[in-house]
Amino acid sequence: MNLKSVSVSQIRPEVSEILVPGEDIIQCFQTVRDQVLFTSKRVFVVNVQGITGKKVSYYSYPYSKVQYFGIETAGVLDIDSELVLVFSDGNRLQFDFKAGVNIKGICAGISKYIL
């Protein structure tokens, strides 16, 4: 599913308990149930599972472990954009964003923390 931009007030309340002091949420995105947060220290993924949504997984991907990343901007027929992050351990994350999301802004934000 494609991610759409949401405000910080729409993130799951328990996320604030997991962030470390001095860590700021820069951008937030979500699908129907899952969320992806770009903070000043990491990419944080909230994966809501099951029919009731009571089971939730939290994944932290620190910028310090990003080996490289790339973006694919929206085109004429393909209006969605994409971000790929590759980590030093070989793991790869791919996020697809709905039309209208500033993928270049996300790229600039990540660059600020990993370069």
Predicted regions and their residues:
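Anionic N-terminal interaction surfaces
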Residues: 1-36, 92-93, 98-100, 104-105
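Charged, low-complexity, helix/coiled-coil-prone segments
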Residues: 2-15, 44-58, 112-113
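Hydrophobic transmembrane alpha-helix bundles
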Residues: 14, 63-71, 96-97, 110-115
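Phosphoinositide-binding peripheral membrane targeting modules
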Residues: 18-35, 39-91
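Short, Lys/Arg-rich amphipathic alpha-helical interaction segments
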Residues: 80, 84-115
